[in-house]
Amino acid sequence: LRLFYQEWGFSGDREAYFDSRNAFIDQVLQRRKGIPVSLGSLLLYLGHKLGFPLNGISFPTQFLLSLNWPGERPIYLNPFNGEIVSQHTLQAWLVGHKGPLAKLKPQHLQSVDNPTIIGRWLALLKSALLREERYTLALRCTDLALTFVPDDPYEIRDRGFIYQQLQCHQIAISDYQYFIEHCPNDPAAELLKTQVNALSHDSQVTLH
């Protein structure tokens, strides 16, 4: 950790957390700044190369790492700053995220596989690109995510939004309808029905 954070100078970007450069690994390596999932992924790679028993954890509030020496309790690391995180702190984070009745459970601290880590990274990168209105790159993130979860209605809904911004209304309508059919009870479904009607009307006006 001293090598990574002090000698090499990696750190979490507190000033521009949602900057997409904090998710692109090449930019993280160049700038020495990132977010938990990008810094954590680099630490995982380095740790595995050096033989450390590191694992990724998709904690609700942010990506974490666990160091699991045989016969010892796991040590939880915050890759944003390299600090050890106690279970008391994790409980506090969970309460802040989910409410006062939230309880820290073993499943919150389970190790995850590489596809899950990639999925979390893609979601954060896509979110950053959407904030920056870089829709073509955001679409590539969604397409890549759908190779892992081809039928995920929420990912398909997001793809529909991106296609709408790219003025590809017919494809957007198709994606929105897929979400409405598969998640009829989601609050977003009613809003998307209105959006589909508006897009359909716009398409008809354009055709005429």
Where are the language model's segments positioned?
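A structural boundary/capping signal
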Residues: 1-208
